[in-house]
Amino acid sequence: MRERVLALLRQVASGEVPVTDALARLSLPDTESLPFATIDHHRALRQGVPEVIFAAGKTGDQVLAIARRLAASDVGVLITRVPAELCDPLRSCFQGIEVNELGRIAYLPPAEPPGAGQGEILIVTAGTSDLPVAEEAAVTAHALGNAVARLTDVGVAGIHRLLSRTDALASAAVIIVVAGMDGALPSVVGGLVPVPVIAVPTSVGYGASFGGVAALLTMLNSCASGVTVVNIDNGFGAAFAASRITHGYAARGAQGVSQITQAVHSNS
């Protein structure tokens, strides 16, 4: 795909192809059909991020085949919900692939690094049991070109742990808060910071947590204004949303997050 795009851009530069025609061509679908999948090679051109492989429900051979085709385009490969039995085959097939077994996620960096987001994405977990979802978010955010920091096991059962790290909260551009049980931590964080807070309910908890539904409802009903909520255990979705925010900051120029934060503080 990269070679075809480069050839088209050269034709535009030489005047052989009008800009409007080139734009129309680049907007057309560019897919590759396998017996079990239709790979979207133009996803990166449309959305800025290549297609991501969701491994759950797929056989190991299917995941590897899709990954090989994406890797051949030099766009990088991100695979979520990787089962334990697929970790070693991925390492054998792809030199340089990073497999995070705790987060059940694998990442093969592209030939060229992705554009950098402005500022740091901080991932806060209520408890150690929330780490698998948090690691999915961390690897995803890194793969999308972001600086990532972690703040682990600072839930409301010992709120002093969080309050002793307000420096980390204050320096973040976007904060992802991952919590199960009662799901109260995002509201606490949302009441302390002026930056976007993305809440991720997890399925961690005893019976009446209903597999994360209790945490989800708590987060949806947060009294901290502006807390955004994604689906249960969806660390990937939270990181994707956070990355769009940081890349939006970057697109607005060098004024950066610090000036935005100062403006919010001055008006509060």
Where are these regions (language model features)?
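Long amphipathic alpha-helical segments
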Residues: 1-83, 88, 92-93
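Short glycine/serine/threonine-rich phosphate/pyrophosphate-binding segments
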Residues: 61-63, 130-135, 159-160, 179-188, ...
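Short, acidic/small-residue loops that bind anionic groups at enzyme active sites
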Residues: 98-100, 189-212, 267-268
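C-terminal binding/interaction regions
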Residues: 125, 166-170, 204-268
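Glycine-rich phosphate-binding loop
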Residues: 164-202
